Amino acid sequence: MSENIKPSEVSEVLLQQLKGIDTHLQFDEVGNVLQVSDGVARIYGLRNAEANELLEFENGIMAIVMNLEEDNVGAVLLGPTDQIKEGMVVKRTKRIASINVGEGMLGRVIDPLGVPLDGRGQIGGELCEMPLERKAPGVIFRQPVNQPLQTGLKSVDAMIPIGRGQRELIIGDRQTGKTSIAIDTILNQKSNYEAGKPVYCIYVAIGQKGSTVASLVNTLRERGAMDYTIVVAATAADPAALQYFAPFAGAAIGEYFRDTGRDALVVYDDLSKQAVAYREVSLILRRPSGREAYPGDIFYLHSRLLERAAKIINQQEVAEQMNDLPPSLKGKVKAGGSLTALPIIETQAGDVSAYIPTNVISITDGQIFLETDLFNQGFRPAINVGISVSRVGGSAQIKSMKKVAGTLKIDQAQYRELEAFSKFSSDMDPVTAMAIDRGRKNNQLLIQPQYSPMPVGEQIAILYCGTHSLLRDVPLHKVQDFQKSFLEMMRADHQKDVLDVLSSGVINDDVTAIIEKVAADTAQPFKVNE
């Protein structure tokens, strides 16, 4: 047997094996858990860790660095605290917290790290890595808001118009219809999607019940809105860190669409819960607290998030130089995109002068204020027109709507005052009586059921009837019936020559003559029956 072994063959085999040995050493910077409690771990040994860097524990759970101290690192856990023990090994990933974004995300429900929650498998297609934290575009890369974002709600589109690239706050007590306004806005983008000009929607659920999120996703799916929508969910059962990072994940996804030249809408529902989650994390990290025990940088938290909403300049060569562009987007940047933000804030007993509400009001470009009393009286959406405002949306409103509804906001505010005075007065002059009657009827016109957004052409047609006193012969309790009959007749006989023309921003004598004739014909039976 030994005679058959040739030394040359042995040396050849040994040489082959030696060639296959990898002599490169892989160094991982690791540390150990000193202490863990309430979703925060203190780690010793990671001297070169960076702020917002992802860390990985030996059991696969991830954390994000938030505190950099002399002898240890404070990291917030993105998984269950009970699975982390003292002494566990932690390694740096050398990656700043980010999310992988792509077209395959549309129609999916994910967590703030991009992990699917809907049981429909991994997210497919090409993905770009987008950092959760990123500087907002500089002034030179922006352009003024000049294009409308139609919500499908008459009250909003007529009196508090929203433009693409705007930040419009939705504020009110619990159970006043804040989420409904945001969901109706998402549903109203279906016509844009079908026309091949989609506004991609991102709904961020922060600290809500899992059942509420599931019901909402079901509503969007039933109405065909999930085709252009992504839901980011950090429910009440998730760690505070995930609830804190959820809005940043939504902003990062929106920026992917914005920077590739498309329009996106992100809804943060709601930032009050994010502020509470951030307060919880900050207090556990022993950061100094300020007013209402919130940390000192709570204003900066919301301002740096909401400043990321913008309308990007139309010049391609300028857009390509945008500050803080992620490497994954190089070569894919297109000019003219937009990211619109609808942050939601919950107030306590209508107190808009509290700390977080005043912060966000001062950051945003306007607010839609919802009132419990109006909601309980059946005026839905329950918008208080007097203190709701849109600071930049007016320049984005289409001309036909501006012409028809230009004075509606002031008229309705004056009607409220006149009605309050009329309670103390027994006799009224005819002008005041007429103004109050018109105000009441306009109020009825502005009532809109949930999940039934209206095309802008129909909105303008029916509001023309209200603002031009075409309802004077219709009894107050019949206004809703008049609206239904009027719009049915307009859709059947005047879709192209009136409604489509109004939608394009044009209003002329021919169009108004048709509206007045149809309104007179529709009002006739209501007048007779009275």
From Swiss-Prot:
InterPro entries: ATP_synth_asu-like_sf, ATP_synth_asu_C, ATP_synth_asu_C_sf, ATP_synth_F1_a_nt-bd_dom, ATP_synth_F1_asu, ATPase_a/bsu_AS, ATPase_F1/V1/A1_a/bsu_N, ATPase_F1/V1/A1_a/bsu_N_sf. Its main location: membrane. GO terms for molecular function: ADP binding; ATP binding; proton-transporting ATP synthase activity, rotational mechanism. It holds the Pfam family ATP-synt_ab_C. It catalyses: ATP + H2O + 4 H(+)(in) = ADP + phosphate + 5 H(+)(out). ATP binds at G172, D173, R174, Q175, T176, G177, K178, T179. It is a peripheral membrane protein. GO terms for cellular component: plasma membrane; proton-transporting ATP synthase complex. It is found in: Cell inner membrane. CDD domains: ATP-synt_F1_alpha_C, ATP-synt_F1_alpha_N, F1-ATPase_alpha_CD. Keywords: ATP synthesis, ATP-binding, Cell inner membrane, Cell membrane, CF(1), Hydrogen ion transport, Ion transport, Membrane, Nucleotide-binding, Translocase, Transport. The record marks S388 as: Required for activity. Signal peptide: none annotated. The keyword Transmembrane does not apply. It is an enzyme of class 7 (translocase). Its EC number is 7.1.2.2. The keyword Membrane applies. Belongs to the ATPase alpha/beta chains family. F-type ATPases have 2 components, CF(1) - the catalytic core - and CF(0) - the membrane proton channel. CF(1) has five subunits: alpha(3), beta(3), gamma(1), delta(1), epsilon(1). CF(0) has three main subunits: a(1), b(2) and c(9-12). The alpha and beta chains form an alternating ring which encloses part of the gamma chain. CF(1) is attached to CF(0) by a central stalk formed by the gamma and epsilon chains, while a peripheral stalk is formed by the delta and b chains. NCBIfam families: atpA, PRK13343.1. Produces ATP from ADP in the presence of a proton gradient across the membrane. The alpha chain is a regulatory subunit. PANTHER family: ATP SYNTHASE SUBUNIT ALPHA, MITOCHONDRIAL. This is ATP synthase subunit alpha. The gene is atpA.
